[in-house]
């Protein structure tokens, strides 16, 4: 355990990054921190149970999801105030980034309780780094709205941003999102479609939106996606 963590001498909240696909990517510090927690708050207890079994840690877990976050945040903060060390994880990546966690972190900050990050894998930054698109300036949009009108409104708002746009999309909506991107951003924008990062079927497809939309429609759309869009006029 990091000496700085132990020296706090009180309850605290750990934000612990977990692998985004390949369990071998978990850090030594993350393993130590998970094992030292009194309780782990997680999106899906079944997913976290597999991770804990993989690292050989036996720690109780509690469900912390979008549906119960408003209720659980103050309850967990109460436990931290009583001296417990609680770890917060998402199913994959860093908690509170397009995943539950913001309300618990905010509650801890309001109460002046320590919040300690344990950094690690992040799908958005990984996809950006390998895309070949500009990395000096970027805007993370997270998940776009479910409906086309909402997606188009967000894309229209940021289409002139002078850097790369990073978008998460589910396998159920990615084809529709690509169609909206072509309509709003134009067919010639450069795009990277990152799928199943660090997993067996990892792929990175890079090209113009129009070309990738056509080729994507001819292939299986299974997996988890990060879309990185280059700025207007950028030539790959």
Predicted features along the sequence, with ranges:
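A contiguous loop/helix-start segment that scaffolds small-molecule binding in enzyme catalytic cores
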Residues: 10, 85, 164-236
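Alpha-helix capping/helix-boundary segments
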Residues: 46-48, 93-94, 123, 173, ...
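Conserved helicase motor
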Residues: 63-70, 144-148
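Glycine/small-residue-rich loop that forms an oxyanion/phosphate-binding "nest" at active or ligand-binding sites
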Residues: 65, 73-122
């Amino acid at each position: 355990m990091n000496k700085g963590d132990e020296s706090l001498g009180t309850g605290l909240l750990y934000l612990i990054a977990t692998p985004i696909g390949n369990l071998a990517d978990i850090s030594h510090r993350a393993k130590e921190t998970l094992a030292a927690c009194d309780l782990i708050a997680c999106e899906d207890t079944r997913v976290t149970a597999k991770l804990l079994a993989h690292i050989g840690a036996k720690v109780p877990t509690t469900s912390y999801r979008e549906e119960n976050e408003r209720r659980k945040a103050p309850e967990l903060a109460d436990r931290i105030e009583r001296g417990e060390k609680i770890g917060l994880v998402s199913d994959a990546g860093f908690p509170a980034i397009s995943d539950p966690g913001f309300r618990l972190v905010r509650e801890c900050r309001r109460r002046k309780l320590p919040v300690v990050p344990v950094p690690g894998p992040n799908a958005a930054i990984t996809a950006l780094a390998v895309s070949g698109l500009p990395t000096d300036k970027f805007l993370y949009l997270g998940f776009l709205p479910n409906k086309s009108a909402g997606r188009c409104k967000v894309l229209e708002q940021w289409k002139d941003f002078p850097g790369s746009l990073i978008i998460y999309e589910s396998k159920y909506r990615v084809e529709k999102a690509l169609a909206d991107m072509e309509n709003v951003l134009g067919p010639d924008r450069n795009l990277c479609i990152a799928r199943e990062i660090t997993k067996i079927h990892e792929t990175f497809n890079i090209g113009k939106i129009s070309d990738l939309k056509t080729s994507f429609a001819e292939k299986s759309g299974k997996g988890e996606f990060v879309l990185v869009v280059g700025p207007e006029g950028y030539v790959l």
